[in-house]
Amino acid sequence: MRTLAIVNLKGGTGKTVSAANMAHILAALHRKKVLLVDGDKQGSASRYFSVYGEHDGTAALLTDPERDPAELIYSTGYNGLDAITSNMELYTTDRELWADEDDNHVMDLRRALDRVRNDYDFCIIDNGPAADIITLN
């Protein structure tokens, strides 16, 4: 699985639109299996594909690295395109992980996504406009 992260520390630059369109084009036109990871607390990519939820998603994956990521993957309704959602829980999770001095969480997301790497051709990560734990992952 090839992973592409869309990052810019400025808001309103088209990160979500770029990530969502790239994911959809890879799935629809190139027939690739794509996992879109919403790494923005606002959950814009999740809303884009109407899979926004109040629970689970990226925050749950980061707070419980042993959790099976397959439990957190939602179908977007588009063939070949799945998503791990995000919401404001990611804000709290980010603060908790930064405060945890006993562990280095920089590779948690990567380790979790490694468990589904054989299920997808691409992973597109939509990051928020911040240098937070999800962006560093």
What residues fall within each predicted segment?
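P-loop NTP-binding core
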Residues: 1-137
